[in-house]
Amino acid sequence: MSKYNLSLNLTVCPFYSIAFLQNQYPLVSSISLSANPDSKTISNIRVVLTADPDVIHEASWDLDFLEPGTGSILLNKSVRISSEYLSGLTEQVEVLLKFEVFSGDELINTVHQSTALMPKNQWAGFNGMPDLLAAFCMPNSEFTEELVRSVSETLSASGLPPQIDGYQSKTRDKPHQMLSALWNVIKSKQISYVNPSPSFATKGQRIRFPDDIKRTPNAACLDLAMLFASAIERMGLNPVVLITREHAFVGAWLIDQCSQFVTNDDPMDLRKKISNQDLIIFETTLAALGSKANFSQAVDSGEVLLSEDQEKDFIFALDIKQARKREIRPIPIYEKPSDEGAVATGVE
């Protein structure tokens, strides 16, 4: 409470990135004012937001007056941050937000809040909007499309129908065949496994995009899980990404369904769907360089990770199709052809 008997209450996201902006998550989700019962009526109120460094457009909120002992929620107004600036970040930037309250020309209160602007490849973890992990599933990247083309060739070489046709067959066999072929394709890329960041599930980590994996080629467990999920979505199937305390792996629906919610923290429910052959999960790190495991062995390993014995480590499963229904879109990646302007790639 300030000496002017006026308090300013804020809800500010502690971290923010292009994924938040792209999917319309507000940086400042609420602003309210309240006056003490013993205060005088305050008139011509304006709340002004500025930032240091100056990376956020100045914003202001107006209120005609505030009676003693009353409060007011200010009209919602989005705080504008340059998408170009957020897309170009390569390191985290700490930003100090300053909210100043004026009555006419008189400054009567100041509140400071901080937020961290993250690089576009940074996921904030389970403690920071876990749904936004779906933004890192990138079905339209060049490497994803390359993988899916190779899946068709692999199916054809095995004497199977080469069409990448999602659930059009109305059987569980064709999705399973596509997933098995995808496993072999990614395994052939000889991607080297690297350790994930400690406690990445709760604190988050940088995620290598598909084209980054192709270039290096290195990947941690979450990178591989999102690479598989990207290709699975590109094939017209519905991927599921599973997160435990120290690991990530992937799965897919064998029928054209999705979970009721974007995230599911009930391993028993997932095991039931697997038992009904509606869902298949597999350990993606076994597709990394040096592993001799086949797809069936990867499936067995995935089911062990979701078993009752491992429940204490399970955090959640992310359903990509349900996320898309909630309009969580992939992070835009801007390509710059030699003779054209920048082009953003995303879900069509």
Predicted features along the sequence, with ranges:
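A structural boundary/capping signal
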Residues: 1-348
